[in-house]
């Protein structure tokens, strides 16, 4: 019997998969517990429509990420952060990704999750630093962060 999986079932299939399984297993376990439904013409066309909508949504998200990348990598987009520093231009403390995200939100009204900012080590010196930001699994931008002394 052909079924469409509604959830991931370990060892059998993932959500959205169409597979042939034994009739008894399908009727007595998969369909009964809501893990799958029978694959007929109506359910197959509904699945195709859902996949098409999912692809369209993913394309929109990718387009938004590329638009955000263009804005963040613009020459004029420089995130300025003030911090206390010593005479040798080393900071007292450091600037973590959370502070960069807050400054980006204040200065450019861009809400960005601090976990998307891929800062290997917190910034500990004055000057310009290029910081990578993962906007999408295919799109990564670099923002300029300028640390100035208070």
Curated annotation (Swiss-Prot):
<dbReference type="Pfam" id="PF03948">
    <property type="entry name" value="Ribosomal_L9_C"/>
</dbReference>
<dbReference type="InterPro" id="IPR036791">
    <property type="entry name" value="Ribosomal_bL9_C_sf"/>
</dbReference>
<protein>
    <recommendedName>
        <fullName>Large ribosomal subunit protein bL9</fullName>
    </recommendedName>
</protein>
<dbReference type="InterPro" id="IPR000244">
    <property type="entry name" value="Ribosomal_bL9"/>
</dbReference>
<dbReference type="GO" id="GO:0019843">
    <property type="term" value="F:rRNA binding"/>
</dbReference>
<dbReference type="GO" id="GO:0006412">
    <property type="term" value="P:translation"/>
</dbReference>
<keyword id="KW-0689">Ribosomal protein</keyword>
<dbReference type="GO" id="GO:1990904">
    <property type="term" value="C:ribonucleoprotein complex"/>
</dbReference>
<keyword id="KW-0694">RNA-binding</keyword>
<dbReference type="InterPro" id="IPR036935">
    <property type="entry name" value="Ribosomal_bL9_N_sf"/>
</dbReference>
<keyword id="KW-0699">rRNA-binding</keyword>
<dbReference type="InterPro" id="IPR020070">
    <property type="entry name" value="Ribosomal_bL9_N"/>
</dbReference>
<dbReference type="GO" id="GO:0003735">
    <property type="term" value="F:structural constituent of ribosome"/>
</dbReference>
<dbReference type="InterPro" id="IPR009027">
    <property type="entry name" value="Ribosomal_bL9/RNase_H1_N"/>
</dbReference>
<comment type="similarity">
    <text>Belongs to the bacterial ribosomal protein bL9 family.</text>
</comment>
<dbReference type="InterPro" id="IPR020594">
    <property type="entry name" value="Ribosomal_bL9_bac/chp"/>
</dbReference>
<dbReference type="GO" id="GO:0005840">
    <property type="term" value="C:ribosome"/>
</dbReference>
<dbReference type="InterPro" id="IPR020069">
    <property type="entry name" value="Ribosomal_bL9_C"/>
</dbReference>
<comment type="function">
    <text>Binds to the 23S rRNA.</text>
</comment>
<dbReference type="Pfam" id="PF01281">
    <property type="entry name" value="Ribosomal_L9_N"/>
</dbReference>
<keyword id="KW-0687">Ribonucleoprotein</keyword>
């Amino acid at each position: 019997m052909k079924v469409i999986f509604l959830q991931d079932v370990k060892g059998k299939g993932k959500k959205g998969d169409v597979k042939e399984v034994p009739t008894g297993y399908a009727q007595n376990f998969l369909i009964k517990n809501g893990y799958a439904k029978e694959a007929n013409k109506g359910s197959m066309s509904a699945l195709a429509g859902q996949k098409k909508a999912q692809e369209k949504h993913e394309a929109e998200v990718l387009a938004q990420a590329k638009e955000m990348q263009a804005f963040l990598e613009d020459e004029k987009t420089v995130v300025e952060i003030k911090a206390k520093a010593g005479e040798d231009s080393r900071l007292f403390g450091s600037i973590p990704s959370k502070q960069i995200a807050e400054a980006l939100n204040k200065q450019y009204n861009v809400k960005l999750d601090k976990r998307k900012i891929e800062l290997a080590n917190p910034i500990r010196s004055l000057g310009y630093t290029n910081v990578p930001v993962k906007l999408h699994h295919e799109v990564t931008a670099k923002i300029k962060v300028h640390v100035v002394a208070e």
